[in-house]
């Protein structure tokens, strides 16, 4: 089937997805906000989903429709399944790890609850695997933690990352994947948070080693620079005495 075939007018598809979001989120008051930016997120406490408006004036193509479905299903799934007291929601690197893990657990649960979700999530994983590979290959992304987390997310779903991981990202994967894969055993978001904390410690050790190695190299360079400067001065002093 051609990717160029159109199925719905733009707002017809968005309206349909808004209804599905409420059904999946088990809340008829779930609100989907379409905007002109690039952010995709859900406020699980207020039941609000924010996703970019599809720029398809002539109609929604197959790819655009699948992308729209994937975004809405995913964020509605978080509203349905991701339950964590607001005060316990972490920030920083731990938040990134939690989000990556919870994405995998939530999608697995929603795929069992709702017929049709699995094929959409599988399509999305393949789509973003290609897109992320393009970003990294074109040097548009340089974030080892993010790179490692998305790589492990694909690996858990049986996909090999479609790019060669950077050195630090690969070290992160080597250190944490044996724990990351346990996410499918987690029964809820609190258990995922506990797993995220374990992985955070492992990744912090890797990062600390990188920092120490960088500091050692800098210290060595500083020492060499100091010695070179002293040698140069000694040579100059010797010439002055002659």
Question: What spans do the regions from the language model cover?
Answer:
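Pan-zinc metallopeptidase signature
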Residues: 131-241
């Amino acid at each position: 089937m051609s990717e160029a075939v159109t199925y719905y007018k733009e707002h017809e598809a968005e309206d349909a997805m808004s209804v599905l979001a409420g059904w999946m989120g088990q809340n008829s008051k779930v609100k989907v906000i379409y905007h002109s930016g690039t952010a995709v997120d859900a406020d699980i406490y207020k039941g609000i989903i924010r996703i970019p408006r599809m720029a398809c004036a002539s109609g929604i193509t197959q790819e655009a429709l699948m992308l729209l479905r994937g975004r809405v299903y995913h964020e509605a799934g978080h509203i349905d399944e991701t339950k964590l007291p607001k005060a316990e929601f972490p920030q920083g690197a731990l938040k990134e790890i939690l989000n990556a893990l919870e994405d995998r657990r939530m999608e697995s649960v929603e795929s069992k609850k709702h017929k049709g979700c699995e094929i959409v999530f599988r399509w999305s994983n393949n789509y973003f695997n290609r897109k992320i590979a393009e970003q990294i290959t074109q040097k548009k992304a340089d974030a080892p933690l993010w790179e490692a987390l998305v790589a492990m997310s694909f690996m858990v779903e049986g996909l090999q990352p479609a790019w060669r991981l950077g050195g630090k990202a690969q070290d992160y994967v080597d250190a944490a994947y044996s724990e990351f894969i346990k996410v499918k055993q987690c029964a809820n978001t609190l258990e995922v948070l506990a797993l995220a904390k374990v992985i955070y410690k492992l990744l912090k050790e890797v990062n600390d080693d990188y920092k120490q190695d960088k500091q050692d190299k800098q210290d060595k360079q500083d020492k060499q620079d100091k010695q070179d400067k002293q040698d140069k001065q000694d040579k100059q002093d010797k010439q002055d005495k002659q």
